[in-house]
Amino acid sequence: LKLLFVADIFAQPGRRVAAALIPEVVREREIDFVIVNGENAAGGFGLTDNIARKLHSYGADIITSGNHIWDCKEFMPYLAQSDRVLRPFNYPTAAPGIGSVVATARNGVSVAVLNLQGRTGMPTTDCPFLAGRAEAERLREQTPLVFVDFHAEATAEKMAMGFHLDGLVTAVVGTHTHVQTADERILPGGTAYLTDAGMTGVRESVIGVRPEMALQRFLTQVPTRFKPAEGKATLCGALVEVDASNGRATRIERLQLEEA
């Protein structure tokens, strides 16, 4: 099985390059299942009903997220009833939405997706290590293919999660920083790992934001509402190849694809 993960889609430029390249990658690389992180898809902050539907139309089977999933309050009713859009699993159970799901790939294989959020430098949540392992074990009872999007700030926390779940899940791929790391590998237990998949948006930016606005914030320390950068966009992410019989990853490849 071939699984495509698309890193944090940032605002309209990210949606534009996702619309153009996801179908192309699915076709050319014979992808069976697509996961995208959509928490920044609405202007950089959150998600809307309409944008979620668009991401699905581009080919996304499941949409994962992180702390920005709560930014658009009007999206909460959609999130509460959707089984294709995830919020981090380790939020309290009373929070709208679900944090894991088992879906069917194009080749008929069942794939579980688990969304977790870190705690270092992030909003307070339940422990992702305890909650994540327990849920991964539950999901493994339904399918050996379990993909984890770990939305976290700290590199060390992400690396620790990779080893914590090694051999139990198919892949642990980090999101949130919008800067792709170059440490993709298969861990000793057969789990594919990448500290951060990066960002799908404008490369010539400060993690998706117009550079002059980010600089103004750093120079003055005055809070300001950021605006998304404009220009040529890049799709970042990862392609994971899996032995569907046991859920172990056989290969992971980083992706950086520029729009035409």
Across the structure, where does each feature detected by a protein language model lie?
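Acidic, metal/ion-coordinating pockets
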Residues: 1-260
